[in-house]
Amino acid sequence: MRYLINLCYNGSKFYGYQVQKDKLTVEGEIEKCLSTIFNRNINTIASSRTDRYVHANNQYCYFDIDIKVDINGLKRSINSMINDYIYIKDISESDIDTRRDVINKEYIYKINMGEYNPIEVEYVNQYNKIISEDVLKEFISRISGEHNFRSFTSDKDNNNYVRNIMISYYIDGDILYLVFNSKGFLRYMIRNIVGLLLDINDGKKSISDIDMIFESKNRCSLLRCASGCGLYLNKIEFKR
C-alpha cells in the first residue's frame, strides 16, 4: 500500500527538507516518527526538497508499506510526537508518485517593502525599500516563459536547465508577494531570480542585463541570492 502525506512546516528551524547526517531536517523528522510507529525503517519520497529556511504550506511525500494503515490514527500519532514546527495536514491512500506525477508547483516569495519588522525576519525578506511597479512588471515579462535558467542555479550536474515558468504578483500593505508557477524549478532558481530583481531595483543591475544573463549560462553573472526565509512552497498539483 502507498500512503500520501500532506504536510506544512516552518522551515526556519531546519537545515532544509532532505535528510542530512547530524542535522535537523523535515524529512529526517518524518521518517523518524514513521519508523518508530511501524517499528521498521520507513523511507519517504517528497515532491520538493526545499532548502534551509524555506517554508511549506503544502508539501507532499509518500511511503510504501505492506500493511493496511488506520490513516486517521496515524495522523494523530505522528502529530503527537513530531517536531512542533511540522504538522501533518492529511494522509490518504494513493498511487501518486510525488515526483513523477507533478504537473505544477507554486511557490510564493514575500518581500517587506516597508519598515523593518524583527518579528517577521524569519518569514518575510526584510528588503525595506519600495520596488517600482514599472520595474516589477518589465522584469516579470522578461523572466516569465520558457528559458534556459542555467545562470540562475548552482546545480552543475543537471541535464536540462530549460524551464517554463509563470510569475505574477500582488501587494498587500507593505508586503510584495511574488508568485511562481512551473512544473519544476532548479536549485536556488527562485531565490536567484528574486535577487536579480532586488539588484535591478537597487541600480546594481539593469533590465537590459537580463538577456545577457540568460545567454551567459553562468551563475557568476548574478550578484545576489535572496534569503530563503521569504520563500514558501505553496501548492503542488498532480496528474490524476
Where are these regions (language model features)?
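Structured-RNA-binding interfaces characteristic of tRNA pseudouridine synthases
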Residues: M1-R240
